[in-house]
Amino acid sequence: SVIEAKMPHKLTDFRQSLEANNMEASTWLVEEVQKYIEEYYAKTGSLRVLILNSWLGIPLVPLLCENLDVAQLHLVDIDEESIELSKIFHKHYAQEKFINIRHWNLDVPFEFENLNKIDVDLVICICTEQMYPLKELTTKNPQAILAVQNSNVVEEMYGINCVSSLDDLKEQVGIDEVGFEGTKKQTYYSWDGKKEYDRFMI
């Protein structure tokens, strides 16, 4: 495989990106975004999308490109190797669907000034547990949709910024107008057995 040939140490990341929780969270987000855009958003085609902490882009990039009319994708991650693999995994969307894909190797909390210059319709962050609050993120488009998820897996040190409720997530992101909010139960395995937690999305 590409990973084995180029970066065998990234096989664990690849396996984690295919885990049920990540798949379910990504699918849930894309389904709700699709519904929201069809019902409320003035623009339904040629969408410009910014993904923060895009990692390998799996499964989010294929889900977006196969289910929405995406014209541009901006994928932002601090890990340069993940970006290189993402370029390989998703190049056919650029070649066959003519989606303009741009990768950014940035550390999000220190790059709001640059990120806010990007003109997009949709901003996605599926793992705000691992990020500092996004209140400073505005993008160039005041009408942009922001779709984010977080969880309450605090005891595992899963992330630096877990939340305990939807209200906490709204405050963390700095959103006033909420078009969708929801909670989904998920499970993971710890040293002392199976644990249940809440995944929040707005």
Ranges and model annotations:
Residues 1-45, 81-122:
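S-adenosyl-L-methionine
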Residues 43-57:
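Conserved class I S-adenosyl-L-methionine
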Residues 46, 119-120, 143:
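Local beta-strand N-terminus motif with an aromatic residue
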Residues 56-70:
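Conserved SAM-binding loop of SAM-dependent methyltransferases across substrates and taxa
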Residues 71-78:
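Conserved SAM-binding motif I beta-strand of class I
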Residues 118-135, 152:
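A short SAM/SAH-binding and catalytic strip from SAM-dependent methyltransferases
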Residues 132-201:
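C-terminal substrate-binding/active-site "lid" region of AdoMet-derived donor-dependent transferases
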